[in-house]
């Protein structure tokens, strides 16, 4: 589906920009552990942006609702997993206490990623 191709390319471009910010701007504000956490968010965003592009290509060739569901799980995973790591890094950069709600969002995002990959697998098997 074209929407997933567009979102995938936008999220990939955003991950490059966020990675550059982490390497050049954020590095001046936080410790190495926080940079590592931030970069994990960037990496997983890029992996799953590329997965969205792949699913978008597959969806153009196959009418399979599982592909759409996989994409929504990948997007939700990016928002929850990478987004929570960006939030955590931002609070640390501002020398603020990280709110407790941020921590459980990260594993939720990881679960969404896993479900997205499993849905993609089922879509490929169903084909």
Regions from the PLM with identified roles:
Residues 1-127:
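Polytopic transmembrane helical bundles with strong interfacial aromatic enrichment
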